[in-house]
Amino acid sequence: MSGSAQWRPMGQGDVDAAAAISDRVHGAYTEKPAIYAERLRLYPAGCFLLERDGQVLGYLVTHPWAGDRPPALDQLIGAMPDTPDRYYLHDLALLPEARGTGAAAAAVDLAVELARTAGFDRITLTAVNGADVFWRRQGFVDAPVAADSYGADSVSMVRVL
């Protein structure tokens, strides 16, 4: 692999690749391919793949959301909220070979740009598998919201823009 990895828009043909990465990276927190397909259908502007020399190395899924409670893990949402009040970073996953390359920070920058462009003043997320340490380095702080479907070790977080 000689080129640098780049974030590009996700297409419906990329859903299985995103789901396979989720299976590899997230363990118990993985989601069905239908979840990624739905988020892409509902808000394609917020879905991206990290690719280098034709190999998919990661994905980013973001979308508008309303209210303090995040979308439930591995559940379809049906539609974007009519009156969203925040931008939700649903998932950022990188294969091990893409970690430490700056790709995750670039994904956060992309999410911040998308949120600001859409007029939101904050991004929320649910950190799992100890990822709260990474998210704090990206300017997120703990939020006092229970993300029930994500388990007791999950951490709800927010970044004010």
Q: Which residues does each PLM region occupy?
A:
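Glycine-rich phosphate/pyrophosphate-binding loop shared by adenosine-nucleotide-utilizing enzymes
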Residues: 5, 55-59, 87
